Amino acid sequence: MTELSPKQKAFLKSKGQGLEARLQIGKNGLSDSFLKELEVALERDELVKVKVGKFVEETLAVEAASKTRAALVATLGRTALYYRRSKEPKLDLPD
């Protein structure tokens, strides 16, 4: 899992404000297909916003981060923001 400094988290949160949630953790939880989609989205975009379903445990957001080796940048309500540096970095994080 990627460790982020407070400055990096603030930077990523500001970038994430304009993003639409692309994925949703539904009642099926962290299915293999969901995790695969999240892996692809993280590799492609590095920063991914995910909706957490109404009847889903919020701990699944943390579990999804560890299973995909991503950093859980922030959670706000039922939305989680994930970051993982891709092989070809797109975002230039501050130090």
Task: List the model feature ranges, each with a label.
Residues 1-95:
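Positively charged, polar, low-complexity stretches
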